């Protein structure tokens, strides 16, 4: 009986999330494009549906184990088999030449993917010889590696980018005069391009007309004459053409700079509003949190340690010991850690979706939108699986054992170490990158 | 070239519909070999003979400004694009015949360009919705061009062409449907070439021979009002 109740809860909640995912999909991603196929939608929905493992937190029954296992199997099936195959199929259909044997080439691409996927497991200490080839542990371990790398990269970048974006301390001062000056330069460049192109067009036209005249059979010498005159003309022309190319490159740069200035000006105005001030305040908190995380990651690597207790229980223990407040440690730690973990997951999902949406807009066009959606689904799926792996760290002991049961025997410590390493690398490189970008921009404007 | 001589025509449309290929075809009579994404704006020049074949024939340079981007861009990108909409004399709206959304987005594109260039006594649209009256009063000549005609199968062609005819009527503009990879569609003497030539003539006339253009414009308005009454 309770099994039925649990199943119905699962199904309803999955339908709910499916509704959200669908809304997001239709509203944000596909607003401007019409061409999509139903199969893609199906795949995307299935991925979102099956990724809702965290919901199992709310089920207090033994059927939880069954649901977890079921969800996991479905996700893996989709991630490793269906989505890559679809991606291969759509990439192939974009290339006009291979239209005939679409399916064949898609299968070839899929097999290549599987081969590299398998090879991925070799350099890492995750292969335990007691399990067979197609066991869940094998698949999860590989998916976990990719997902953890991705997560660490994104977290590293996000940890640095977040304070940079939120805090108005980093905002360059942009005045209207700057923007006007840059726009004037842009228009001047366009005018120069136009005048040069007019000269080329006139030269082409006169050559064309003269060429017609010379097409009359004036004989051998007429042909020689036309060759010599046009050679001088075309040399001049190619010089002008080169200048035009250089100017066009310049105009593109100026356009991008102007767009950048407009965006900065908008941000300045936004930061003066209440919302902006609130985010600025948050930015200070985040920067402290990020510095702490980077510090912890370094310590973990240097001192080769993996945390034994989760931070919430630790925090409560500290308060109990130092402040003498009487808590029922077990009871509170369980609930608080659930809530915290829920918040972390929700914010990280939101962050991921926002970043991916921006990326999607930047590189999308009506041709490749199918492939990009599928890539999105693939990335999200891997992200979810690996977040389950890593969440294990922040949970109290009893729940860790449950996850260990479901996911089988994996070397969890390895994943945490790997996460720390990649996180550190990513955070440091994004600091470097942002520093360079920040320094370069004011210098460009000084040169105006 | 002094600014007085300029005849500026914008080429607007969604990403990937073929504006750059079209502009290259119009200016060089050749097919563009390696189309790539347009960042910012790319300009090209076409030499046009106004009133070709008559004693009043005169040569003008028409600047075709191909502005890249999508209609749903961030506000900062839109305000950057707006710098190209100054003092325009004509608009070519390009849409992809295989993609209905690109045709629908043309309304938003035209509003974006026209709102920027509104004269002090001109019609202002405040909520961005399409208003047919505004296009009836609009004085900037428009031309609607549909691309990728070769990718429409024969069976669907009629349906697509009817839809685009309605679209052109909404804009009070002529329409041309072609394939940018085939210069045959704009061969001299074809109906498409004639429409194109008429459009450019209209643009030049409005710019330089205002009285002549105005009388013609008012006459066509009267004709249309009479039609609607019946």
Swiss-Prot record, chain B:
A Gene Ontology biological process term: natural killer cell differentiation
For this protein, the record's PROSITE patterns field holds: RAB
Q: Which GO terms describe its molecular function?
A: GTP binding; GTPase activity; protein homodimerization activity
- One cellular component (GO) term of this entry: endomembrane system
**InterPro entries of this UniProt entry?**
P-loop_NTPase, Sigma_54_int_dom_ATP-bd_1
Q: Which residues bind GTP?
A: 16-21, 148-150, 179-180
Region (Small GTPase-like), start-end ranges? 1-230
Q: Does the keyword Nucleotide-binding apply?
A: yes
UniProtKB keywords: GTP-binding, Nucleotide-binding
Keyword ATP-binding appears in the UniProt entry: no
Cited SMART domains: RAB
What the protein does? Required for KRAS signaling regulation and modulation of cell proliferation. Regulator of KRAS prenylation, and probably prenylation of other small GTPases. Required for lymphocyte development and function. Not required for myeloid cell development.
Please report which protein family the annotation says this sequence is part of. Answer: Belongs to the small GTPase superfamily. Rab family.
**Self-association and partners:** Homodimer.
Protein name stated in the entry: Rab-like protein 3
The source organism is Gallus gallus (Chicken)
What does the organism's lineage look like at the top? Eukaryota, Metazoa, Chordata, Craniata, Vertebrata
